[in-house]
Amino acid sequence: MDRKENITPNTLEIQKNDEIEGTFCHELFENSFFNEKLCQELLVELPNINKTASSTRIIKWIISNVDTCFTSHHDDNDLYQIKNYSKKIEDKWKEYRQILEKYT
């Protein structure tokens, strides 16, 4: 059996539901914490996810919302702050973003 068939299509859907604790999106959107380990775990799963219109939409949604978090963090008029922000984390996100974009 192909490994892609073993991976539930819910892998990305779980990320999209930012109320599910223990996901990269939940940590960043709800807890304002960029969890690099959870982001890396998501990236590792990408090759195992069938490319569909839905998966492409969700990946674009993740990219857009993470970008918004960084934009909000830098906006003096916005109360949202990434608790563990550093230039290094933002630079890492730019690398991770390029990987995600390959799957859209």
Say what each PLM segment does.
Residues 1-43:
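Short terminal alpha-helical segments
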Residues 63-104:
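Amphipathic alpha-helical binding modules
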Residues 32-40, 53-60, 86:
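Amphipathic, non-membrane alpha-helical segments in soluble helical-bundle scaffolds
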Residues 48-72:
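Short hydrophobic interaction/assembly module
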Residues 25-32, 52, 79-82, 86:
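Alpha-helical rod/repeat scaffolding segments in eukaryotic adaptors/tethers
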Residues 43, 47-50, 90, 97:
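Residue-level detector of alpha-helical secondary structure
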Residues 27, 48, 98-102:
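Residue-level signal for well-ordered alpha-helical scaffold segments within enzymatic catalytic domains
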